[in-house]
C-alpha cells in the first residue's frame, strides 16, 4: 500500500475482465477497495486499446495481415511455433504497456501496477521494452488476498465510479475491444476504402493454431 507515501503516486491499471471476476460485488465497490489499498488512481487497460488502435490500423493496412500484441503468451507462441509469421506481430506495445507508458509520461512520479487475470502478463513486464512502464503485475487472486489481509469486505464498500474519460480526454471515448477500435481507426484514417478488414478472434491455443495455419 502507499498510505503515508508522498514520494510517488500509485496507479492501478485494471484488465476489462475485472468486472466479471469479482461477481460477489459491484465493480464500483472493487474500485473503492483498490483505492483503500493505497492506490491514487484506477485506470482501465481498455484505454490502451484505443491508443494502440490508431497506429495499429496503419500497420495493418501496410502489412495486409497482423496479429495482435495484446497477449504475451500468444506473442511467444508465434515466435516459437510460427517463426515465419514473426514479422506480422504488431510492433505496438500491448494496450496495458501503452496506457502505462502514457501514465508515466504524464506523471513522472507515477508507479504502475497492472491487475489482471493472467500470469503471462508477469512475464511481459520483465521484457526490456515494457520494463520502464510497468512496475509490478498482480493477479485477481493476489488482489483478493490483499483485500483479505486488510479485512476489506468489498461487497459492503461504497461504489466509486470508474470515470477515466475525465483523466484522459475524448481520445478514449471509443470502446468495444481492439478489433472495433482498429475498425474505427481505419475509417478515421481513410484506409477503409482501400483495405478489406477481416478480423479473426480466437479463444484458446487450439483456435489460435487453427487460424494461423
Question: Can you say where each PLM-predicted feature lies in the sequence?
Answer:
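Iron-sulfur-associated redox domains of electron-transfer enzymes in respiratory
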Residues: 2-213
Amino acid at each position: 500500500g502507499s498510505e503515508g507515501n508522498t514520494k510517488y503516486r500509485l496507479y492501478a491499471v485494471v484488465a476489462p475482465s475485472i468486472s466479471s471476476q469479482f461477481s460477489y460485488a459491484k465493480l464500483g465497490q472493487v474500485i473503492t477497495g483498490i483505492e483503500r489499498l493505497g492506490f491514487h488512481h484506477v485506470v482501465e487497460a481498455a484505454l490502451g486499446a484505443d491508443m494502440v488502435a490508431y497506429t495499429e490500423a496503419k500497420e495493418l493496412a501496410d502489412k495486409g495481415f497482423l496479429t495482435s500484441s495484446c497477449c504475451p503468451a500468444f506473442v511467444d507462441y508465434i515466435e516459437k511455433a510460427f517463426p515465419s509469421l514473426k514479422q506480422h506481430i504488431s510492433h505496438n506495445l500491448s494496450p496495458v504497456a501503452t496506457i502505462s507508458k502514457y501514465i508515466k509520461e504524464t506523471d513522472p512520479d507515477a508507479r504502475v501496477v497492472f491487475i489482471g487475470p493472467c500470469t503471462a502478463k508477469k512475464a511481459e513486464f520483465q521484457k526490456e521494452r515494457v520494463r520502464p512502464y510497468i512496475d509490478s503485475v498482480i493477479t485477481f487472486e493476489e488482489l483478493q488476498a490483499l483485500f483479505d489481509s486488510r479485512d476489506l469486505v468489498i461487497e459492503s464498500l461504497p461504489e466509486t465510479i470508474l470515470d477515466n474519460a475525465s483523466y484522459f480526454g475524448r481520445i478514449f471515448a471509443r470502446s468495444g475491444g481492439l478489433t472495433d477500435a482498429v475498425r474505427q481507426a481505419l475509417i478515421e484514417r481513410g484506409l477503409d476504402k482501400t483495405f478489406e478488414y477481416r478480423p479473426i478472434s480466437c479463444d484458446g491455443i487450439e483456435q489460435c493454431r487453427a487460424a494461423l495455419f
